[in-house]
Amino acid sequence: MTNAPNVYEQQFEYDDADPPGYRCGVARVSRAAGGKDIVIKEFLIPPGETLCPYHYEYEEEWLLVLEGTATVRTPEGEQEASRGSLMCFPAGPAGAHKVANPGAEPVLALMWSSAREPSVSVYPDSDMLGVWAGEDHVILRRADGHVDYYEGE
């Protein structure tokens, strides 16, 4: 029998290491449903919090707002995304985005993309690069640290 988690009845996890302004709840919906090829996460974004820093990935990402109204920053500027809004963030710099909740009510949203690993994210505002190879193996580095291809060989 297939697992069928209800997105309106999730228990959210919080990471104590998240700084103020980025404290959001996450529920790993696709994992609960037994998915392997697509990663679907549900986020509870409290008022005044932001889901993650402005970034882009090298794979398509999607956002569906289930409840509330978020402000979404993209290369074209900021726009509101309210209940039922579906947004696609294309792979690469054109898909850069940041999802924030400047309002007074929580925002409930789904985000999904492929589950390919490693996953690479670029953070243009902080000149940072992130590489994820599983949930427990993350590398975050400043992008300006040039290393010669053969250094250390």
Tell where the protein language model's regions lie, with residue ranges.
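Short, mixed charged/polar active-site loops
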Residues: 37, 51, 78
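Ligand-binding loop in jelly-roll beta-barrel domains
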Residues: 91-119
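Short acidic-glycine-tyrosine-enriched beta hairpin
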Residues: 62, 75-92
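Conserved short histidine dyad/triad with adjacent acidic residue
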Residues: 24-26, 41-57, 94
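A short, N-terminal "cap"/entry segment at the start of jelly-roll beta-barrel domains
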Residues: 1-37, 122-153
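Histidine-centered metal-chelating micro-motifs
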Residues: 50-52, 71, 86-87, 92-98
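Short, conserved beta-strand element in jelly-roll/cupin
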Residues: 42-46, 55-74, 112-116
